[in-house]
């Protein structure tokens, strides 16, 4: 789910600053001209980038850009609100958050480039195939047992528990396949965006450092809810399996890439 940014009941258009960033990133990316033409950019509510669709699909892709990609001088921090805070003193308790939310142009370009490459319809199709297979398998297994009259003599409660167990197995299998697949995709697109050039690599490192810094500050400002959302390192908290690659891992990937490139003789 995403939310378009509206102002005066109209969709807020991209500012000249953001349009300039998008133009530079599209110029640097390796997509074909027709693929670039399938991308649409819009303002999105929140502080995270968003993407959907694919440049390799007939419908194209969409990328949502948060307000923090605007020129910091144009942002009215007085109108920003945190959940559980009617107001926030941006000069005192919010100063560190402002610093964490403020990105250089290189960091913004890395984020945009990563989202552009992430607009791949095959990732969506892979997820659809995985989910279909993981839930069809237990369904077919249960149908076969019913057809062979294997479990029909069991009490209703026992049969119900067995059905639930079968589909729970399918869900666990789905997560065990889907999550690592998403992690691999995240690594691939992070690296692809970073190798665009030295500025993108440096921007990527800053991008993830700032996200970790932001999450740690939000953990403190949001109190108990913040502790449930983020750990002490700034990674998002998940129960058991992690659907997203931890931010710390993504940062370390780029830092290792930077070390490898520096080790290569000029």
Residue ranges and their predicted role:
Residues 11-37, 146-225:
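Short helix/loop segments within enzyme catalytic domains
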Residues 105, 121-129, 153, 157, ...:
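Structural motif marking the loop-to-transmembrane transition
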Residues 1-116, 120-121:
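Peri-catalytic and regulatory segments of divalent metal-dependent proteins
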Residues 122-150, 207-214:
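Post-HEXXH active-site segment of zinc metalloproteases
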Residues 16-27, 99, 152-153, 232, ...:
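Polar/charged alpha-helical tracts
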Residues 44-59, 194-266:
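Active-site-proximal gating segments in proteases and membrane effectors
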Residues 63-65, 69, 110-120, 129, ...:
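Long, contiguous hydrophobic alpha-helical segments, chiefly transmembrane helices and signal peptides
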Residues 113, 134, 138, 165-169:
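Hydrophobic faces of alpha-helical transmembrane segments in multi-pass integral membrane proteins
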């Amino acid at each position: 789910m995403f939310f378009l940014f509206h102002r005066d009941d109209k969709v807020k258009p991209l500012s000249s600053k953001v349009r300039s960033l998008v133009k530079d990133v599209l110029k640097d990316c390796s997509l074909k001209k027709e693929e670039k033409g399938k991308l649409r950019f819009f303002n999105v509510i929140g502080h995270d980038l968003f993407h959907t669709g694919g440049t390799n699909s007939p419908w194209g892709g969409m990328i949502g850009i948060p307000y923090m990609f605007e020129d910091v001088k144009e942002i009215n921090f007085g109108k920003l609100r945190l959940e559980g805070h009617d107001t926030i003193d941006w000069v005192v308790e919010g100063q560190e958050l402002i610093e964490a939310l403020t990105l250089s142009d290189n960091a913004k370009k890395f984020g945009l480039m990563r989202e552009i490459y992430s607009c791949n319809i095959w990732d969506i199709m892979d997820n659809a195939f995985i989910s279909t297979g993981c839930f069809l398998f237990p369904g077919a297994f249960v149908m076969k047992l019913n057809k062979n009259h294997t479990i029909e003599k069991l009490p209703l409660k026992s049969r119900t528990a067995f059905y639930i167990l079968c589909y729970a197995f399918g869900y666990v299998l789905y997560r065990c396949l889907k999550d690592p697949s998403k992690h691999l995709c995240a690594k691939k697109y992070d690296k692809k965006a970073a190798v665009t050039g030295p500025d993108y690599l440096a921007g990527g490192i800053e991008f993830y450092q700032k996200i970790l810094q932001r999450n740690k500050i939000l953990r403190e400002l949001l109190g108990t809810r913040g502790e449930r959302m983020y750990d002490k390192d700034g990674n998002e908290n998940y129960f058991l399996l992690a659907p997203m690659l931890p931010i710390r891992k993504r940062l370390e990937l780029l830092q290792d890439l930077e070390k490898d490139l520096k080790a290569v003789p000029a």
